[in-house]
């Protein structure tokens, strides 16, 4: 059973390049789905998401030759006041690198008060334009800025679509995003007992518009709370979503894997397949 972690931060999980590679290898070995270990799920592919120029440059250098590790590059709202020298030129250049499949994460974050709203909006729109120039999907960050984000995307709808990562809004908002060609991605917080709003959304929106992610090292699934989130833990989110949808894990995994390829405009020919069924080393 194969899984695509559509959003993780290897550079935030580990600065050490050896540890980054180990996290990838662990994910590709996977986790058992049941106590008897008769069923197994492996993270066959992942998207490493950057939040700033340094994050991309260092992590891309460390992992660019590893099969099935893809990258996006973008500057998150946290970088609005200090994006780096010549950031637009560098972004424009680096988006041509091999296995770079999207622009992100980009968006709006009014919770942390990065700059002011107008600064964030201008920063976001500039990167939407760059994504359009390169004909790439966008990976979206939204925190307490849902209406502004929706208004911007209505006027500047990405032609290659996008992913609203770590979804946190209601069902009505999800459908509005889906209408704009945006996939809805659920992270480990879907498994939290009190996340009833997310449970409702995940249970009811069309399966063909759903993705899963870890957002590693953040939002560790409930089964591993207290540990830093790692790509391998995405198995728990898959299992939880299967229960919400009342469907076999295997069937759901196949649908989500296909959705992930579509969201990032990848095909099976872009992947190298593995048959690793050894147990992962759980901490």
Where do the model's predicted regions map?
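Mid-domain alpha/beta scaffold segments of enzyme catalytic cores
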Residues: 1-283
């Amino acid at each position: 059973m194969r899984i695509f972690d559509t959003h993780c931060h290897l550079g935030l999980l580990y600065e050490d390049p050896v540890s980054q590679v180990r996290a990838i290898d662990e994910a590709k070995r996977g986790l058992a789905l049941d106590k008897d270990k008769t069923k197994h799920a492996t993270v066959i592919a992942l998207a490493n998401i950057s939040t700033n120029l340094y994050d991309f440059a260092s992590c891309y250098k460390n992992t660019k030759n590893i099969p099935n590790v893809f990258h996006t590059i973008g500057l998150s709202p946290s970088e609005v006041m200090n994006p780096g020298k010549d950031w637009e030129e560098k972004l424009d250049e680096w988006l041509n690198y091999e296995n770079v499949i999207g622009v992100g994460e980009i968006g709006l974050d009014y919770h942390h008060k990065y700059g002011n709203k107008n600064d964030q909006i201008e920063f976001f729109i500039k990167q939407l334009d760059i994504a359009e120039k390169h004909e790439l999907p966008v990976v979206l960050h939204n925190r307490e800025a849902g209406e502004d984000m929706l208004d911007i995307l209505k006027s500047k709808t990405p032609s290659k679509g996008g992913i609203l990562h770590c979804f946190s809004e209601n069902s009505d908002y999800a459908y509005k995003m889906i209408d704009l060609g945006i996939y809805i991605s659920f992270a480990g917080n879907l498994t939290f007992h009190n996340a009833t709003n997310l449970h409702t959304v995940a249970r009811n929106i069309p399966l063909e518009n759903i993705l899963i992610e870890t957002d590693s090292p953040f939002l560790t699934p409930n089964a591993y709370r207290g540990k830093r989130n790692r790509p391998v833990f995405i198995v728990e989110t898959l299992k939880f979503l299967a229960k919400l949808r009342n469907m076999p894990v295997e069937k759901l995994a196949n649908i989500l894997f296909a959705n992930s390829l579509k969201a990032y405009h990848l095909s099976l020919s872009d992947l190298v397949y593995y048959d690793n069924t050894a147990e992962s080393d759980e901490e």
